[in-house]
Amino acid sequence: MDKTKILILCIGNSTRSQIAESYFKKFAGDRIQPYSAGLTPSKIHPLTRKVLAEDGIDMVGQYSKSVKEFLGKVHFQYVFTVCDLAHQQCPTIFLNAKMIHWDIEDPSTCGDLEEICIQKFREVRDTIKFHVKEWLTREN
C-alpha cells in the first residue's frame, strides 16, 4: 500500500512546519510520508532543534526546503498550512490535495530573552504535537 503523502507548509520552514514533520514521522508509522517546506525558506531555528530534543526527537536529516522542490514531483494527498500567510499564499498547484489549516503562532517573534523564547517554542511544540495526534486519530 502506498504511503499517504502530506506536505506541511509555512513561510520559512524553520520552526512550525519542521516540528509538524517531526511529529508526523514519530506518530504516523509507515502509513504517512511527511514533507515540510517554506514559501521563502530560511535555516532551522536552533530552538526548534532544542525543544524537539527535549521530547526525544532527533532532527537528523531535516533541513529547510523550498516548496519549489516538490512542485510537479510529489503528489500530495494533504497539504497542511501552519500559518495564515502560508495559507493565503499557498500555491494553487496543490488544488488536488485536501487543504488543512492550523493557525500556529510564530515563536521566533518572542524577542531576545532566551527563557521567554524557549517557553514560546515549547508551547508551539506542544500545540503542534496535539494537532498531529488528533488528526492521526481522526484519520485512522
Name these PLM-found stretches:
Residues 72-95:
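Mid-chain, well-packed structural core segment of small domains
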Residues 46, 65, 74, 115, ...:
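Generic alpha-helical secondary structure signal
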Residues 38, 83, 103-105:
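Residues at the C-termini of beta-strands that transition into short coil/loop
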Residues 87-140:
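Phosphate-binding/catalytic loops
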Residues 1-70:
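Conserved active-site segments centered on acidic
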Residues 13, 52, 79-80, 128:
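Conserved small-residue
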